[in-house]
Amino acid sequence: MESKGRIHPSHHHMRRPLPGPGGCIAHPETFGNHGAIPPSAAQGVYPSFNMLPPPEVMEQKFVAQHGELQRLAIENQRLGGTHGSLRQELAAAQHEIQMLHAQIGSMKSEREQRMMGLAEKVAKMETELQKSEAVKLEMQQARAEARSLVVAREELMSKVHQLTQELQKSRSDVQQIPALMSELENLRQEYQQCRATYDYEKKFYNDHLESLQAMEKNYMTMAREVEKLQAQLMNNANSDRRAGGPYGNNINAEIDASGHQSGNGYYEDAFGPQGYIPQPVAGNATGPNSVVGAAQYPYQGVTQPGYFPQRPGYNFPRGPPGSYDPTTRLPTGPYGAPFPPGPSNNTPYAGTHGNPSRR
């Protein structure tokens, strides 16, 4: 770069004159291994002509030097072209630098103007910010109120959901009201029917209880009379055995075979032939009765409550044949419907159906 613009000396000026007469060049190959010039040559004492190299060698050296000089010239030309292009690039770069300096100045001025405008805006915004402190407080209060309103809205939505569910349940209940009313009316009618049935059965039970009490009294009187007749029959039988009449053996055999006494009883016309009544046991002639009270019984079977001996022509709970039939008094029940079956007449009056305390 520093040598650019200078004129380089040509290779003709760079040649050195040949020392000594004749202008011959002393080649270093002829002077030892290191190429040093001998001191005799340095002192101006030149070798003889016989010591000079041959002309072919000199010509080859000249050709080599000429090629080197041409190469250097070509390189110099290339360097000159490169130097010119670099000078052009330098001029363009300097022009660009000048333009950049101008742009930087304009940008600095614009930046200063912008900064001044921004400073003015910041000052205005600071004044407005100071004025907007009250607005900020109001905004905070409004946000708090909005949050509270959102919470209240959520609560109201949950309440509305609950009320909607309750309304749906109420609607379903309201839809069931006609069925419930009809069921209530049916239950009311059934209650009235059951009440009428209960009153009717109660009246029937009271009448039946009174008839049973009267039959019990009659039975007690009959039992006493049967006891008397039994005693008389036993006395007659004993007297016949003692007498040993002609028909005593046949009578006793008939009694033993059938288990019944021959002859007609006192109540045979009304109740049929009486069954065999065992002899009363001493100390066991009384038995409790839950309806009538304590009464005298002539035989052991009636000492237990609810015990009634089977007889061919008389049923104690039902009474004598044709005397009393409670079913004839109940053709129909309440409202014209068939009356439900009552307690069995074969059940003792002191049993489950005949006990007033269990009703």
UniProtKB/Swiss-Prot annotation:
Highest rank taxon of the organism: Eukaryota
Gene3D superfamilies: 1.10.287.1490
Keyword line: Coiled coil, Developmental protein, Differentiation, Flowering
Keyword field contains Coiled coil: yes
Job description of the protein: Has no transcriptional activation activity.
Family according to the record: Belongs to the FLX family.
Protein name according to UniProt: Protein FLX-like 2
Phylogenetic classification of the source organism: Eukaryota, Viridiplantae, Streptophyta, Embryophyta, Tracheophyta
